[in-house]
From Swiss-Prot:
Annotated family: Belongs to the acyl carrier protein (ACP) family.
Protein name: Acyl carrier protein
Recorded name of the encoding gene: acpP
UniProt main location, coarse: cytoplasm
Organism field: Exiguobacterium sibiricum (strain DSM 17290 / CCUG 55495 / CIP 109462 / JCM 13490 / 255-15)
Limits of the Carrier domain: 1-79
Amino acid sequence: MTKEQILVDVQEAIAEKLGKEQSEITLDKSFKDDLGADSLEVMELVMDLEDKFEITIEDDQAENLKTVGDVVSYIETQV
């Protein structure tokens, strides 16, 4: 799976969870500051991504995933 495909899949999940347009979900966007996600939404998104990519994201690792780019890079190392 390419980084670009991971990004598209992550964008789709974020758009669905947060009600955002995929075009505004870029690698540099912060979940909380730019996309307006609260802590619960971020944790729900992590669970959705775990299911989508069939991976496990440990809680301590999830806390370090602040931007869309962080998530894409992490998933890239896991698939």
